[in-house]
């Protein structure tokens, strides 16, 4: 970030040389870069995984700049909050769905999952899918997910919450209801303040609240 001559803050996005940063590429058991395959509606986005050691904590980062992806999808992670609402949705699918898939590939399983802001809300879609795949009903799965989920709201004003039109949301999330054991309308209603209101968009924050036992704000 820099300041202009009149004191305005300017955000600059520069290409990073990962070889000069305190960051390590995560490798698989064969010594190859670990790749997480994240399903969208009818195709996959392939993400590399990087690890940053923050004290005693490992921070894992997803990177779609992978030659297996289309040029459009390679840019998903180029810039935080960059692009249009479609790219924002693809980022949030990567963070939520891809985040849980990454933990599974790394063999990491925790008792509590903390959704820190609505951008990661879709973690609970994947968690429900996983429980249903194990043989649980949707009702059983969502109760387990709720009991082990905490959601933190950082921006408790209308402008701080992401809303997605049903058409756009369905373009990438249309395959998930069947895996969750519910209908498309059921999934949409989990993200609506007024379930059944067809004119209401899907809100990540509402979805996070509806799938978490505890909700707090900072």
Region spans (language model):
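Catalytic cores of carbohydrate-active enzymes across secretory and cytosolic contexts
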Residues: 1-218
